Amino acid sequence: SADCCDIYSPKVVRGSMGAVFRLPFVVSDTISGFLNAHSELESYAAVVSASADKITTTPFASPCIVAVGNEGNGLKEETISACKHKITIPMEGRAESLNAAVAASIIMWEMMK
């Protein structure tokens, strides 16, 4: 979407170590619009919420879409609403949230179990 980073910016290409050229990408005006157009896919919104399903007990479908927001603002409400499932990473201690890359990594690790 227009408010996402440029996947071909030098920082992204360097940070991905070239993986950006081996992964499929989709450009859409809005994430929620894409999710609504592809309702056949299961979709998960990563949120900080006690009412969301814990990733440790979520049976992830394949293929699926997982939306992870940035550290400052999280996901837009329209994106959360468009996702079929709300998931959260159970945390102990005082930390309220995680860096988006760390959160995405943890979610993908759980998905691969």
What is each residue range found by the language model?
Residues 1-51:
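RNA substrate-binding interface of SAM-dependent RNA methyltransferases
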Residues 44-95:
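Active-site/ligand-binding-proximal alpha/beta "capping" segment
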Residues 40, 63-70, 106-113:
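Short flexible/disordered coil segments
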Residues 4-21, 77-113:
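Structured adenosyl-cofactor binding patch, chiefly the S-adenosyl-L-methionine
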